[in-house]
C-alpha cells in the first residue's frame, strides 16, 4: 500500500508505466486503450456507488486496485511480442 499523502498515478501515468515494461512497442496503443477502458469503467462504478468521492479519488482507487504497474507490464510483455 502507498504511503498516505503520496499521490497515485493518473490513468495515463499508470498505462505509461505498464507499457514501459512491454518491449514490443507496436502494441502499446492497444494495451493503453484496454487498460484505460478497464480503469475508467472501475472509476465510474466507484463514483456510482459513492457519490461523495471526487473523480480524482475514484481514479486513484481504480489505479491502486490494478496493482503494481511493473508486475503487470512484465506479464503483458510475455504475451505481447513479435515472435
List the model feature ranges, each with a label.
Residues 1-4, 45, 49-83:
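Cytosolic juxtamembrane regions of integral membrane proteins
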Residues 1-22:
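Short, charge-enriched, intrinsically disordered boundary segments that mark the beginning
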Residues 2-8, 30-36, 47:
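A short, ordered amphipathic alpha-helix with a cationic face
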Residues 12, 29-36, 40, 59-63:
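Short, well-structured alpha-helical segments
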Amino acid at each position: 500500500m502507498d504511503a498516505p499523502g503520496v499521490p497515485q498515478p493518473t490513468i495515463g501515468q499508470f498505462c505509461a508505466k505498464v507499457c514501459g515494461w512491454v518491449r514490443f512497442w507496436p502494441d502499446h496503443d492497444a494495451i493503453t486503450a484496454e487498460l484505460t477502458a478497464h480503469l475508467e469503467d472501475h472509476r465510474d462504478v466507484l463514483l456510482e456507488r459513492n457519490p461523495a468521492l471526487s473523480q480524482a479519488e475514484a481514479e486513484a482507487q481504480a489505479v491502486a486496485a490494478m496493482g503494481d504497474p511493473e508486475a503487470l507490464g512484465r506479464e503483458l510483455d510475455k504475451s505481447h511480442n513479435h515472435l
